[in-house]
Amino acid sequence: MYRLCLSPQRLLLALLLLAALAGVARTAHALEVTDVLGRKVEVDHSPQRIVLGEGRLFFALALLDRDNPFQRVVGWQNDMRLLDPHTYEVYAKQYPQLAKLPLIGQASEQSVSAEQILALKPDLAIFSIAGEGPTQHSPVADLLEKAGIPVLFIDFRVHPIRNTRVSMQALGTLLGREQQAQAYLSLYERHLARINERVATLAADQRPKVFLELLPGVWQAPGHTTGKSGLGSVIEAVGGHNIGADVVPGALGDVSVEYVLQADPDVYIATGNRAPGVLLGAGVSLETARQSLAKITARPEFAPLRPIQAGQAHGLWHDFYNSPFNILAIEAMAKWVHPEHFKDIDPQATMGEINQMLKVGLDGQYWVNAK
């Protein structure tokens, strides 16, 4: 019987050669993207076991894995069920497996367990750079990467206009859904360009003062608002002046009732998604949304504001702040801030275009006017 005999040196050389060839094979099939933090993220195959750092990040997957945005998700946080129950109920009816989808946390970064994530054996973790889930500053991300699990950071929250493109492109590449990602981004940028072109013609003194109150009725005190990032940056992008940014140093903060009354804003917008605040989102009717906004504007603290007195208050679905669908918020806010410049902009028609890309469309009242 013929036996192949190799010296220890030749055996080591052969093993090194095999390892090198295996590395070349992996590299040949590897996918690499740059995330919103400028990090290079590489996977050696299209991920099939995804963990979402926040449940509401699934909105991006809905545009990519259109038939079933949960087909690759093996774990997520419980934030959508807790913080946007209307949307959760709509998707749970379409995808009953959501009730059994493993939870990695509830609705905070502190509640997320790295051990629970590792037990799910994911091949990709998708985290946001701010919010209710693990961020780049979280030890969870470090632990996963040390365990060999790629972590992709996306962002629709901090710099929504700038980072929606980067986030969707990266997801489209890693998931093998480049065509779907580009289809949505083409729509997004076409609609955004109309806003940008008109805002660019405005003079510096043509920026109405806007007070955006986040989750009034749900938040423990009146005056919770945004600084220069997030929806605050959207106010500036549509040609408004965010009065919150003048005094809130960070992303979010509370302003006093006295400050708001003295600032005398021209536009009042309240965000909401659940009781006892402004009811907006999936399955919510116009009548319900308008009645809930009326309760919020009747609060004695801000009832004296000019836009509220004039019946020109507005309500906006809160979850636009962390969603690729933020183009709808951009268009709605543009019409509220500069109605004379954006008469022909129709966010309802834009939502119809987006719904053509979704198996479960956006069906409900996502913005509302006081009258």
What are these regions (language model features)?
Residues 2, 23-63, 179-213, 342-371:
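Bacterial Sec-exported substrate-binding components of ABC uptake systems
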Residues 223-250:
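Alpha-helical, coiled-coil/dimerization segments enriched in small aliphatic residues
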Residues 12-23:
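Bacterial N-terminal signal peptides
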Residues 105, 159-173, 277-371:
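Structured C-terminal subdomain patch of bacterial secreted/periplasmic proteins
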